[in-house]
């Protein structure tokens, strides 16, 4: 198997080989011989005395070419003038020695050998074609059995296996009427005599006639392989090799080490084994050796060739002298160190260097400091050129000398060369495109690169010893691209969310915050100033302080009708610091943006506003000035930390005493048996959690205020100037949670498994921890450190998979013209609007007109890009939902269109053609991956578990509405008890817009009615957070069934209290098999002792107790509707094992089926229950036409529907995690997209990471890019095969044009790994994972790679079809088409 020779430099010397696609196939023996320059007959490599290659050996100069340039081996012909002569003495052609890198040899095998990839790469292709099992084929190949190749007139079957004894018996019986062979010859004979076309016909007929699914799948697979062979014109017997190609010797070198030893490539060993065994076999055949010996030798030859191709795939791996498995040809290309990932995708480049980075606070945003020494080395060729040009040096050698001596002129020339020549800085790991940015170098002394502080966030760099790499763009085009696209000052916005990434942090924030804070009664309060200059003078002469409140006249610039700036003078009440800051504001940015204490969030908003109002250039200048100012005032402010800044609240002792008393009370209740151990633990944890919060609140209240005397002599509170508080409040460093640990109490700690230790750490760091407290704390903290190490690798792998699945998605056209899209609403969770509608639709293109709900007039027409102005207008008009275009519904075939994608987040305008939106999406999702948690539950070292919620309150005034799934009954006390599983109370405002949505659990008590007007803060429902009740919907007298103590229920007596309760035992733990199936249930009787039935049916009421339930009713007890039958204790304070963080994101993108998946209704209809089987319940849904759909559900699962309930298709009927494949099948693409986007966003939102929905949608598009053919119609597809969506669309269009029947297909969801591997490009798939399998499959299919994606083009070394490369590829394409048309025309004229 060989990638067909792309580059043969000898044939195409001086001419660039142009190609548009790469085809892979199986090489025929003739092809292999045609590549070869001669047969390798001997296993020898080089002569040990002369070090010259042996003739006919593995390094033979006659076959592979001369060892030295233009010199034959015996030395008869030397020098260029004999070029092309073949020496008659040694037979070597006189030419360049580098031909030894490309000339191949071959080995003529004495017996055919099966190619291991087609045999052992699962599913076995040989097995598939021959319809034999792998085990059978192996028995034949490795000489354990005969296979009948031609049964002749005997009753034997073709492909039947015979043992040796059988074979000889049959020979006696039938003579030579039949043919049976052993080894690869037998298999080759079978392959050769297989009639491919006939077999395809038979299979197609079978496919139509068969009914079983498994059979259809099996036939379809086999059909696909045979059709591929038929189509590509490759012969089946080529999978068995007669000739083995030999790799050119310089690709498997033999290097002499000192001391007369040699370092050699493992391939030489493997080849030698093959040649040795092959030669031995030839000799044995000539001698007519006994069969058994020949057979053994053939088997050994087969094994040697197996090892050469893929060592270790079958049997034990061949090892070298040092017991290490030898590296075979397959190992050369696969894995991280293989050809693809190491050499083709991970090339190293010249003109680069690396050094440690330090701060460059005086730099401008587009500059970086480059050490002179580095610059001299990096720009050497440029300097040589200039030195020669100026006549300072006559030759390169002389120039080199001057540079080495570092004469003064060299430095002047270096300055010239470097002027306006951008360089690129990169910090590993490069997680997103901002990890490489271009800067203009400024020469500096010293040896460290100086980096602008504001770009640190993008590089994720700090100055604790980080290193960065420098690269020099050489060509003019490269320099231009670096300057226009990559210059740091052109990358102000983050491509992940469109917000500024050039945002001041730490010292700068602290300085700006300190500068813009106001003080009460500072020196000179209430002064009036005519302009800022006057403020400056007053400040410098110490007449006023930085925080003094003053009134000042400020000149602002406002745009007039013509769009030009005009000065407007306003009076402002402000502070000295803010007035000084107003000087650096760009034109057009109103003063009110800085007329407040600037915290980190405010500064971010300020820069964002500046970008939107004043444009890129002014923003960059403004950011730089902010930085200089911030650093200046941070230095002048002299803010530092002292132990006294950590003020411990006076109330702490009292609060601790109170909590201890409560805990003691709970312990007492537990001793008296009023609460279980689990409840006691939960309550204790809750008490300590609350105590910690109270202390933290007291501490923050104490820290954040300080008493001062105002101008009138009264004592007033003002915001504190405590250093620690200022650092946290400004967002420069630290958070309330950390201050709480410094001067409040450390609080509850978690064990590594996530459970909370019930004794909290009551001290803080200022008081110091006792040994025990310290020990408790270390437990969780170490887990955190171990986690971080794992997290990085996992996050990197997720990014790699994401990039791989989206790498070929590029914007290729402006508008695909579709009117499809998704409807966007605000995301409401609990009482909060988590993401407003305006944020979700900003930068999208509308798919249909947006209409004002009150007046009915069109606000925005379809096909409009929604800018900030438009979304604000939509927001004010009270529109609830907007239909926008999305990448998922884009109709463009290979790529996306600009309108479906919308705004390029990093540039703030509609995306350009050629933007690699796929990779950007992958990076935006992958880059914050390291910030996500690895744990399943998110608890830091300090347990940040909110006390369990036990009620919901309204956050705003409005009307309460119950959701459609709401079900409740009224109990004897008149309370409304919820008995539905997915119930929600929704609150609408006066216009009827949804403002809040609250989930209400099963068993909650509702305190409001449907349609009732409510006030903010009103409680809507309450419930017990620690147990889950089991509630009856019917009244009657209790009658138990299967309630046998010790069999189905156990009496649990608490050791401490001596009280006993009945608890249901898990069926799996029961002793006898009969009792495993018994379920304790409760029936209800009326006053006459007759079983009560479900109203409207004849089915008696029967409720089964789930495992672990604590039963709270007695036999014969009268109960009413809504009463509790049993309580199921919730797992103790481990928050329910929710997969969170990184694993959750990976799970969603891999589209994994969850373990205990819930079930969705397959059809719309009415629910009823059928006859139960052992351990399963039968649920039936009958639709309107009376068609019933049955499903069996395990009794352990919770069914969320009841008899007679009407369910809609796609509604949840069994509790559990949702399976995304079900959502796609039953609810469609939009519902699926909404589910994945929301779930992924939830994980990131928890960590405070903002990512645009767009990026997730781009990935979903790639997960949905293949479809399953349900009915092939007349399109030539096979029913049941998976194909690219674009291919089906194209085939269907063609079929409809020709009046044929189009194919029907269903959408399928592929996980990202699967989707990457199933891409059309085999080069991209092979370089991702499972290289062997991908290449084997591609070779059999005779696949052609059209080189559409980015990865394939990088691998073959062309410009990528994205960005500036897209235009290059397009123009080349047009040229080709022009050439083709011309040739066609000339042919016509010739004829």
Swiss-Prot record:
GO terms for biological process: DNA-templated transcription. It catalyses: RNA(n) + a ribonucleoside 5'-triphosphate = RNA(n+1) + diphosphate. InterPro entries: DNA-dir_RpoC_beta_prime, DNA-dir_RpoC_beta_prime_bact, RNA_pol_asu, RNA_pol_N, RNA_pol_Rpb1_1, RNA_pol_Rpb1_3, RNA_pol_Rpb1_3_sf, RNA_pol_Rpb1_4. Signal peptide: none annotated. Keywords: DNA-directed RNA polymerase, Magnesium, Metal-binding, Nucleotidyltransferase, Transcription, Transferase, Zinc. It comes from the Bacteria. Pfam families: RNA_pol_Rpb1_1 (PF04997), RNA_pol_Rpb1_2 (PF00623), RNA_pol_Rpb1_3 (PF04983), RNA_pol_Rpb1_4 (PF05000), RNA_pol_Rpb1_5 (PF04998). One of its GO terms (cellular component) is DNA-directed RNA polymerase complex. Its EC number is 2.7.7.6. DNA-dependent RNA polymerase catalyzes the transcription of DNA into RNA using the four ribonucleoside triphosphates as substrates. Belongs to the RNA polymerase beta' chain family. This is DNA-directed RNA polymerase subunit beta'. The gene is rpoC.
């Amino acid at each position: 198997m060989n990638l067909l020779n792309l580059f043969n430099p000898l044939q195409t010397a001086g001419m660039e080989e142009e190609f548009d696609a790469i085809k892979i196939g199986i090489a025929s023996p003739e092809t292999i011989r045609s590549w070869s320059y001669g047969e390798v007959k001997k296993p020898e490599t080089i002569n040990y005395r002369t070090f010259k290659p042996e003739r006919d050996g593995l390094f033979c100069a006659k076959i592979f070419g001369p060892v030295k340039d233009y010199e034959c081996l015996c030395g008869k012909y030397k020098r260029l003038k004999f070029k092309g002569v073949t020496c008659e003495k040694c037979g070597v052609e006189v030419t360049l020695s580098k031909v030894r890198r490309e000339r191949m040899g071959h080995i003529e095998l004495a017996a055919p050998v099966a190619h291991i990839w087609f045999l052992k790469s699962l599913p076995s292709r040989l097995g598939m074609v021959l319809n034999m099992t792998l085990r059978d084929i192996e028995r034949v190949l490795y000489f354990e059995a005969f296979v009948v190749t031609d049964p002749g007139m005997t009753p034997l079957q073709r492909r039947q296996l015979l043992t040796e004894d059988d074979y000889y018996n049959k020979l006696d019986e039938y003579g030579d009427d039949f043919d049976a062979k052993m080894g690869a010859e037998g298999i080759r004979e079978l392959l050769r005599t297989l009639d491919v076309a006939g077999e395809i016909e038979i299979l197609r007929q079978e496919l139509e006639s068969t009914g079983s699914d498994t059979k259809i799948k099996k036939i379809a697979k086999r059909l696909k392989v045979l059709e591929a062979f038929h189509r590509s014109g490759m012969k089946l017997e080529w999978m068995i090799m007669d000739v083995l190609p030999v790799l050119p010797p310089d690709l498997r070198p033999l290097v002499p080490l000192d001391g007369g030893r040699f370092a050699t490539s493992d391939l030489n060993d493997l080849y030698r084994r093959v040649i040795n065994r092959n030669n031995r076999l030839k000799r044995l055949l000539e001698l007519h050796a006994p069969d058994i010996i020949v057979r053994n030798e053939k088997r050994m030859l087969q094994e040697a060739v197996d090892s050469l191709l893929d060592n270790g795939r079958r049997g034990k791996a061949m090892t070298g002298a040092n017991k290490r498995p030898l590296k075979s040809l397959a190992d050369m290309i696969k894995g991280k160190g293989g050809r693809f990932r190491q050499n083709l995708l991970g090339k190293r480049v010249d003109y680069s260097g690396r050094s440690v980075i330090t701060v460059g606070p005086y730099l401008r945003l587009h500059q970086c400091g480059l050490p002179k020494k580095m610059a001299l080395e990096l720009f050497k060729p440029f300097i040589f050129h200039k030195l020669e040009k100026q006549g300072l040096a006559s030759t390169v050698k002389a120039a080199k000398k001057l540079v080495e001596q570092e004469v003064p002129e060299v430095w002047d020339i270096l300055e010239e060369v470097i002027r306006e020549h951008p360089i690129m800085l990169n910090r590993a790991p490069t997680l997103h495109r901002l990890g490489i940015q271009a800067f203009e170098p400024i020469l500096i002394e010293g040896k460290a690169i100086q980096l602008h502080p504001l770009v640190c966030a993008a590089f994720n760099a700090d100055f604790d010893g980080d290193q960065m790499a420098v690269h020099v763009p050489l060509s003019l085009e490269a320099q231009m691209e670096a300057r226009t696209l990559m210059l740091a000052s052109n990358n102000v916005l983050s491509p992940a969310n469109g917000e500024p990434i050039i945002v001041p942090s730490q010292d700068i924030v602290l300085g700006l915050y300190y500068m813009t804070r106001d003080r009460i009664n500072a020196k000179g309060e209430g002064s009036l100033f005519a302009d800022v200059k006057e403020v400056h003078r007053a400040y410098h002469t110490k007449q006023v302080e930085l925080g003094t409140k003053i009134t000042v006249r400020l000149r602002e610039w406002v745009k007039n009708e013509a769009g030009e700036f005009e000065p407007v003078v306003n009076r402002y009440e402000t502070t000295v610091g803010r007035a000084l800051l107003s000087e650096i504001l760009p034109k057009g940015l109103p003063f009110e943006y800085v007329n407040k204490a600037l915290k980190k969030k405010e500064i971010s908003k300020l820069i964002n506003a500046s970008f939107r109002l004043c444009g890129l250039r002014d923003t960059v200048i403004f950011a730089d000035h902010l930085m200089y100012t911030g650093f200046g005032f941070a230095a002048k402010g002299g803010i530092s930390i002292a132990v006294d800044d950590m003020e411990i609240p006076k109330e702490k002792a009292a609060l601790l005493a109170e909590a201890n008393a409560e805990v003691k009370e709970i312990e007492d209740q537990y001793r008296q048996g009023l609460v279980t151990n689990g409840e006691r633990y939960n309550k204790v944890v809750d008490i300590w959690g609350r105590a910690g919060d109270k202390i933290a609140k007291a501490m923050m209240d104490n820290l954040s205020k300080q008493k001062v005397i105002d101008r009138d002599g009264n004592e007033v509170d003002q915001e504190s100037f405590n250093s620690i508080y200022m650092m946290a409040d400004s967002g420069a460093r630290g958070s309330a949670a950390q201050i709480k640990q410094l001067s409040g109490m450390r609080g509850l700690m978690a064990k590594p498994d996530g459970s909370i230790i019930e004794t909290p750490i009551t001290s803080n760091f200022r008081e110091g921890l006792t040994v025990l407290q310290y020990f408790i704390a270390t437990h969780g903290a170490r887990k955190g450190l171990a986690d971080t190490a794992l997290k990085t690798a996992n996050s990197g792998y997720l990014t790699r998979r994401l990039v791989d699945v989206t790498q070929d998605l590029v914007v290729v056209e402006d508008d695909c013209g579709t009117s499809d899209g998704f409807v966007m609403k605000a995301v409401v969770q609990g009482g909060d609007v988590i993401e407003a509608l305006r944020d979700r639709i900003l930068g999208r293109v509308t798919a249909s007109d947006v209409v004002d709900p009150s007046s009915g007039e069109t606000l925005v027409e379809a096909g409009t890009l929604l800018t900030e102005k438009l979304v604000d207008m939509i927001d004010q008009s009270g529109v609830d939902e907007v239909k926008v275009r999305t990448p998922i519904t884009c109709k463009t075939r290979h790529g996306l269109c600009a309108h479906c994608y919308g705004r390029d987040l990093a540039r703030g305008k509609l995306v350009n053609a050629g933007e690699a939106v796929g990779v950007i999406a992958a990076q935006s999702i992958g880059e914050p991956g390291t910030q996500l948690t690895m744990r399943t539950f998110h608890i830091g070292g300090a347990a940040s578990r909110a006390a369990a919620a036990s009620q919901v309150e309204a956050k705003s005034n409005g009307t309460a509405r119950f959701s459609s799934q709401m079900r409740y009954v009224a109990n004897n006390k008149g309370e409304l008890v919820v008995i539905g599983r997915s119930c929600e109370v929704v609150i609408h405002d006066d216009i009827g817009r949804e403002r809040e949505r609250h989930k209400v659990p099963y068993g909650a008590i509702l305190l409001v009615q449907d349609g009732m007007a409510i006030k903010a803060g009103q409680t809507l429902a309450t419930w017990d957070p620690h147990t889950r009740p089991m509630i009856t919907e019917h009244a009657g007298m209790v009658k138990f069934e299967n309630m046998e103590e010790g069999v189905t229920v156990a009496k649990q007596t608490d050791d401490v209290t001596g009280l006993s309760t009945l608890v249901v035992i898990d069926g799996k733990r029961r002793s006898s098999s009969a009792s495993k199936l018994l379920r304790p249930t409760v029936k209800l009787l009326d006053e006459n002792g007759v079983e009560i039935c479900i109203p409207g049916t004849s089915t008696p009421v029967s409720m089964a107790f789930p495992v672990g339930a604590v039963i709270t009713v007695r036999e014969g007890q009268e109960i009413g509707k809504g009463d509790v039958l049993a309580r199921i204790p919730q797992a103790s304070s481990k928050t329910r094992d929710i997969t969170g963080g990184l694993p959750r994101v990976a799970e969603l993108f891999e589209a994994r089926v969850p373990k205990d998946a819930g079930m969705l209704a397959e059809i719309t209809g009415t629910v009823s229950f059928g006859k139960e089987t052992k351990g399963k319940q039968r649920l039936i849904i009958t639709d309107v036409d009376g068609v019933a759909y049955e499903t069996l559900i395990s009794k352990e699962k919770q069914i969320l529907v009841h008899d007679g309930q009407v369910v809609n298709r796609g509604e949840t009927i069994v509790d559990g995690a949702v399976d995304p494949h079900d959502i796609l099948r039953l609810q469609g693409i939009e519902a699926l997209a909404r589910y994945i986007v929301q779930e992924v966003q939830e994980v990131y939102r928890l960590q405070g990471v903002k990512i645009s929905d767009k990026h997730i949608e781009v990935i979903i598009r790639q997960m949905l890019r293949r479809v399953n053919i349900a009915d092939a119609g007349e399109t030539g597809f096979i029913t049941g095969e998976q194909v690219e969506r674009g291919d089906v669309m194209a085939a269907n269009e063609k079929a409809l044009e020709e009046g044929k029947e189009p194919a029907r297909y269903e959408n399928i969801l592929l996980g990202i790994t699967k989707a990457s591997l199933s891409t059309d490009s085999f080069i991209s798939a092979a370089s991702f994972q499972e290289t062997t399998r991908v290449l084997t499959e591609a070779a059999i299919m005779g696949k052609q790679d059209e080189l559409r994606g980015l990865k394939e083009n990088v691998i073959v070394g062309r410009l990528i079809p994205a960005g500036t490369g897209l235009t290059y590829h397009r123009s080349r394409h047009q040229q080709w088409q022009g050439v083709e048309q011309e040739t066609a025309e000339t042919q016509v004229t010739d004829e």
